């Protein structure tokens, strides 16, 4: 199964952290970027191919992708990233959306168990969706 990760945007709400670094390349755990975490969890879940749709900071994303060897990963460039949102990024990746696939935002953190649970029941539903809701909200 294929996973498509939408990582074309800059993540302006996280400025100044994302001024020159794409959001998916941030390393909140020190050594591991968000993108590396996502791909590792996808691999553990049985995903065998990952397409990362890039835009802002393409070279930084490409550098991370080139260092991954335990799963097939490639990039697809969205030249319209500065003019569009995730819908535009999906349009750029539309030819990748054949057969079963998982679509993930480039800043979505998840554990493999969540994806495995979703995939386990995927055959029963045409478009399974995993979502989470906070029990309470703070002032942000």
Give the label of every model feature segment:
Residues 20, 45, 68-70, 98, ...:
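Short, well-ordered coil/turn elements that cap or connect secondary structure elements
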Residues 60-63, 67-101:
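Short phosphate-binding loop-to-helix
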Residues 111-140:
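Conserved core of the sugar-phosphate nucleotidyltransferase
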Residues 2, 48-50, 72, 100, ...:
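Residues at the starts of beta-strands that form the adenosine-phosphate
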Residues 5, 52, 103, 128-129:
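Structural beta-sheet core signal
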Residues 99-109:
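Short beta-strand-to-loop acidic/aromatic patch adjacent to the donor-nucleotide binding site
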Residues 10, 107-108, 133:
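Active-site metal-binding loops of divalent metal-dependent hydrolases
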Residues 1-54, 58-61:
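N-terminal glycine-rich phosphate-binding loop and ensuing alpha1 helix
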């Amino acid at each position: 199964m294929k996973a498509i990760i939408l990582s074309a945007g800059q993540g302006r709400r996280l400025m100044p952290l994302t001024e020159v670094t794409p959001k998916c390349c941030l390393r909140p755990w020190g050594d591991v970027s968000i993108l590396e975490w996502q791909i590792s969890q996808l691999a553990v879940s049985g995903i065998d191919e990952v397409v990362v749709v890039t835009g802002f900071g393409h070279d930084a994303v490409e550098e991370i992708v080139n260092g991954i060897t335990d799963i097939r990963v490639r990039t697809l460039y969205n030249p319209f990233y500065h003019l569009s949102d995730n819908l535009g990024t999906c349009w750029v990746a539309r030819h990748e959306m054949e057969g079963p696939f998982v679509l993930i935002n480039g800043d979505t953190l998840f554990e493999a168990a969540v994806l495995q649970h979703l995939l386990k029941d995927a055959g029963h539903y045409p478009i399974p969706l995993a979502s989470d809701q906070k029990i309470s909200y703070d002032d942000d």
